[in-house]
Amino acid sequence: MIVAIDGPAGSGKSTIGKEIARQLGFNKLDTGAMYRAVTFAALDRGIDLDDEAAIDALAEQIEIRFTNGTGEDTRLTIDGQDASAAIRTPQVDANVSKVSAYPGVRAAMLIHQRRAAEDRDIVAEGRDIGTVVFPNAQVKVFLTADPRERARRRVLQRHQNDAQPLTAEQLEAEVDETLDALKQRDKLDSSREVAPLVPAEDAVHVDSTAHTIDEVVSIIEDLINQRR
């Protein structure tokens, strides 16, 4: 079975998808992390992000793998090096929409994504899972949330391993800054020519703003159980 969870940045896709996969014993595929990996690799190697041919070539060359770390964490490596934290920086946030819009990059990632789902139960999350990657997925969910709540979640995710927690003032200031970036990314993701961020016609819409993680997981697991 394939469960497709699409939605904008900060809607809770990664957290929800990870928990569903854990509870049901499914494999988890974070396609957004793959595009972040290409973006980080390009920035790290000093490749001009406007050089589409160079970015396309990079996407074909690098080896992106997901491996289990301690506990339930899934680690992402690029050519054998752990990049799990490096792909979640503001610099990557600001540039991943540009990189992921390149048709060559999407084509390279699509091959890996479909291969990962062969002969296994999988929870895949991203922006075009139900429309492009797995259009025949048995369960399709389009997950949304209030933009400011999404920005708050993204900031908390970014600082979850900090030794010193953010003050209330620091949190609100960073949320304001992140909200502007999220709105810009929403615009870019929704308007790109290749695989834009749009819900599949047969997707179930779930607004996670006022729900806990467990509540959203329960809603989606009910859908899965109905279609098994």
Language-model region placement:
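ATP-dependent NMP and nucleoside kinases share a basic, alpha-helical "lid"
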Residues: 84-160
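Conserved lysine of the Walker
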Residues: 13
